[in-house]
């Protein structure tokens, strides 16, 4: 059990982190959305960032409401909020992976004909790929939606005698639900890892190939990109591991350590959100023009 003062302190830290992420997400959507209305077209990276901004905005509000309902034992509200959090969490993972795939396809120097064909196809079909990630998220969330419906039904029958056979079947289903959610996060994370490794290998190869021109702007840009990619890799991997531990939910006493853990998790998410803001040339150009 931790002191109430520490609980309040970490609760405030978590709320401040959440509000910062919400403001960042709103800024990304507002700035890039305005640019879209003006020029009537967006680069694929900006399409992903707008989608990520909307997804993360909804995810953060769902997270805040979900955590407060969990802390104050508002079970009926919690069941509906959990499915919302899971949906936007899985969608955010897919969009982050697509962003890395885009950079890998766009920046990598591999010249294999399959890679070149993939580059041509992916860049042409990017809006459909975004729609596909939304559809995949909708499909993977179905077990969680069924599980939440069952949980709501159980809450309405708390006063009735329990059937042990039915209870066992429901526990087995919840195990399957957990496995489905884990797989839904692991697949885009593996995609992120593969794309990041390919991209880092390509940038390292380019740096070694042009090692004589160490001070030219092109080399500096490659070094900066490689350093940024390494930071993104560490932050996103930490984000994935903390979310996975959160889903497992057996490491900590929820009531006791909830706000400490959430403040820790969302510190990584805040760093990741900030790094994404700095990854858009359009966003940086517009914000510099406003300053």
UniProtKB/Swiss-Prot annotation:
GO cellular component term, pick one: plasma membrane
Pfam families (alphabetical): TAS2R
Cytoplasmic side: 23-41, 106-125, 204-228, 279-291
Molecular function (Gene Ontology), one example: bitter taste receptor activity
Cellular compartment(s): Cell membrane
Keyword Disulfide bond recorded: no
Main location group: membrane
Mutation effect (residue 172 to K): Probable risk factor for alcoholism
Membrane topology of this protein: Multi-pass membrane protein
Biological process terms in GO annotation: detection of chemical stimulus involved in sensory perception of bitter taste; G protein-coupled receptor signaling pathway
Swiss-Prot/TrEMBL keywords: Cell membrane, G-protein coupled receptor, Glycoprotein, Membrane, Receptor, Sensory transduction, Taste, Transducer, Transmembrane, Transmembrane helix
InterPro entries per UniProt: TAS2R
SUPFAM superfamilies for this protein: Family A G protein-coupled receptor-like
Topological domains annotated Extracellular: 1, 63-84, 147-182, 250-257
Residues passing through the membrane, by range: 2-22, 42-62, 85-105, 126-146, 183-203, 229-249, 258-278
Residue positions with a glycan: 80, 163
Quaternary state and interactors: Interacts with RTP3 and RTP4.
Free-text function comment from the UniProt entry: Gustducin-coupled receptor implicated in the perception of bitter compounds in the oral cavity and the gastrointestinal tract. Signals through PLCB2 and the calcium-regulated cation channel TRPM5.
PANTHER family: TASTE RECEPTOR TYPE 2, TASTE RECEPTOR TYPE 2 MEMBER 16
Note: Several bitter taste receptors are expressed in a single taste receptor cell. Confers bitter perception of salicin to non-taster mice.
Protein name: Taste receptor type 2 member 16
Classification lineage: Eukaryota, Metazoa, Chordata, Craniata, Vertebrata
